[in-house]
Swiss-Prot record:
<feature type="domain" description="HTH gntR-type">
    <location>
        <begin position="1"/>
        <end position="69"/>
    </location>
</feature>
<dbReference type="InterPro" id="IPR008920">
    <property type="entry name" value="TF_FadR/GntR_C"/>
</dbReference>
<feature type="DNA-binding region" description="H-T-H motif">
    <location>
        <begin position="29"/>
        <end position="48"/>
    </location>
</feature>
<dbReference type="Pfam" id="PF00392">
    <property type="entry name" value="GntR"/>
</dbReference>
<dbReference type="InterPro" id="IPR036390">
    <property type="entry name" value="WH_DNA-bd_sf"/>
</dbReference>
<keyword id="KW-0804">Transcription</keyword>
<comment type="function">
    <text>Negatively regulates the expression of the glaH-lhgD-gabDTP operon in a temporal manner during entry into stationary phase or during the first few hours of carbon starvation. Thereby is involved in the regulation of a L-lysine degradation pathway that proceeds via cadaverine, glutarate and L-2-hydroxyglutarate. Binds to two primary and two secondary sites in the promoter region of the glaH operon with the consensus sequences TTGTN5TTTT and ATGTN5TTTT of the primary sites, each separated by six nucleotides.</text>
</comment>
<protein>
    <recommendedName>
        <fullName>HTH-type transcriptional repressor GlaR</fullName>
    </recommendedName>
</protein>
<keyword id="KW-0238">DNA-binding</keyword>
<dbReference type="InterPro" id="IPR000524">
    <property type="entry name" value="Tscrpt_reg_HTH_GntR"/>
</dbReference>
<dbReference type="GO" id="GO:0003700">
    <property type="term" value="F:DNA-binding transcription factor activity"/>
</dbReference>
<dbReference type="GO" id="GO:0006355">
    <property type="term" value="P:regulation of DNA-templated transcription"/>
</dbReference>
<dbReference type="GO" id="GO:2000143">
    <property type="term" value="P:negative regulation of DNA-templated transcription initiation"/>
</dbReference>
<keyword id="KW-0963">Cytoplasm</keyword>
<dbReference type="GO" id="GO:0005737">
    <property type="term" value="C:cytoplasm"/>
</dbReference>
<dbReference type="InterPro" id="IPR011711">
    <property type="entry name" value="GntR_C"/>
</dbReference>
<keyword id="KW-0805">Transcription regulation</keyword>
Length: 220
């Protein structure tokens, strides 16, 4: 992609993930060109990439819509992520060295410093950034470029669902404290190199958002 189309791709992807464009909403080219101040060519290139990533669908070979969301897809993606991450934790514990341990500890500390505040996009962005960095630090010890690429793909597929969960938890003091407790327990198991416990904790940790997302999707 060109630099211009890459910008369009990033902006549109971010808007879809955050729900600024709703599932099944038609993406009118006139609206997109106005919103992003980009030409039709770069936007078509950006849309084609988002079709490949299953965030956008083609309508009658001439238009585009935001991809739909469903409970079945939610369960499938999150189950795949949880099992993939659990496997990567096992490999990371077996292969990671002292520098890996130090990085996990540092990222866990940075994440623990965040506390719930006002319902701002900045808070969500900062939490998500540190949360991703923490999880990435853990699995980085596996040392497999290809497995990490597969993990990143699953992460992207889960992004819209994750953002629903983020809005419902990060801005809640009680829920945020529970998440901090989970992260501390997980970090301790990883650094103790307790493979079985760390893997199961990671799997359960990544499955916990499901009920919250289901409630939100049901309008509760």
């Amino acid at each position: 992609m060109t630099i211009t189309s890459l910008d369009g791709y990033r902006w549109l992807k971010n808007d879809i993930i955050r729900g600024n464009f709703q599932p099944d909403e038609k993406l009118r080219m006139s609206l997109l060109t106005s919103r992003y101040a980009l030409g039709v060519g770069p936007l078509r290139e950006a849309l084609s990439q988002l079709v490949a990533e299953r965030l956008v669908t083609v309508v009658n070979q001439k238009g585009y819509r935001v991809a739909s969301m469903s409970e079945q897809e939610l369960l499938d993606i999150f189950d795949a992520r949880a099992n993939m991450e659990a496997m990567l934790v096992s490999l990371a514990i077996a292969r990671g060295g002292d520098e890996w341990e130090a990085d996990v500890l540092a990222k866990a500390h940075l994440l623990s410093k965040l506390e719930a505040c006002d319902a701002s996009e900045k808070m969500l962005d900062e939490w998500d950034l540190r949360h991703q960095a923490f999880h990435t630090a853990i699995v980085a010890g596996c040392g497999s470029h290809y497995l990490l690429q597969m993990r990143e793909r699953l992460f992207d597929l889960a992004a819209r669902y994750r953002f629903i969960w983020l809005r419902r938890t990060v801005l809640s003091v009680e829920m945020l404290e529970d998440k901090h407790d989970q992260h501390q327990t997980l970090t301790a198991a990883v650094l103790a190199r307790d493979t079985a416990r760390a893997s199961e904790l990671m799997r359960q940790h990544l499955l916990t958002p499901i009920p919250i997302i289901q409630q939100a999707m049901a309008g509760n």
